[in-house]
Amino acid sequence: MAEVRVGKNESLDSALRRFKRSCQKAGLMAEMRKREHYEKPSVRRKKKAQARNKKKRYA
């Protein structure tokens, strides 16, 4: 979980910006998007195989 401490003279906007950046670095937004809808394990495997084939094709 991302945590940001707000300084005495720090504006809320800059603290929010730092929080968003830390969430981005931690990969929370991508994880949230991935878990937004349930994905069956078979579909997950199929997508993983397609990504692997695509990567192999362009490598």
From Swiss-Prot:
Bias type Basic and acidic residues, positions: 31-42
Pfam annotation, one family: Ribosomal_S21
Biased composition (Basic residues): 43-59
Keyword Magnesium: no
Protein's GO biological process: translation
Residue ranges of the region described as Disordered: 27-59
Top-level taxon of origin: Bacteria
Species in which this protein is naturally found: Carboxydothermus hydrogenoformans (strain ATCC BAA-161 / DSM 6008 / Z-2901)
Family stated for the protein in its record: Belongs to the bacterial ribosomal protein bS21 family.
PROSITE patterns: RIBOSOMAL_S21
Gene3D superfamilies named among the record's database cross-references: Ribosomal protein S8
Ligase is among the record's keywords: no
Gene name of the record: rpsU
Keywords from the UniProt entry: Ribonucleoprotein, Ribosomal protein
Assigned GO CC terms: ribonucleoprotein complex; ribosome
InterPro entries from the UniProt entry: Ribosomal_bS21, Ribosomal_bS21_CS, Ribosomal_bS21_sf
Name used for this protein in its record: Small ribosomal subunit protein bS21
Gene Ontology MF terms in the entry: structural constituent of ribosome
